[in-house]
Amino acid sequence: MKLPTDTPVKIVMLGAGGTGGHIAPHIYRLLYALDRPSRFIICDGDKVEFKNLVRQNFSPADLGENKAKILAERYAAVFGMEAEYLPAFVEDLDMLTTLIHADGWAGEYSRYPTVREQVILIGAVDNDKSRQLCHK
């Protein structure tokens, strides 16, 4: 996928467990390297459980915390970005549509007075209902 280098980008990732937890740091690193206006929003309503520690990107200190919150705060801080997350499951089309709506960047980035951001949706979910929602 080719995006113009001066267009703001918003990435919305559904799922912060086995797949999402491992790709999140790489997305933050990529956005940092691209050095363009960007947002990365991680969505997951699940909490870190002991069984997750073996195969997911969490530590014992994260137990009981929301997965999206942990990943967003950890890696946004590392790369000097704003932590954006939704500590809830995205379960209906209205909620997803609101998340992926392209926002204008007026005011926040004066170089982009009315530019619409490019939106990328990443489905890193572990259930069929959420996968189907991503394809609608």
Short names for language-model regions:
Residues 1-136:
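Adenine nucleotide-associated cytosolic modules
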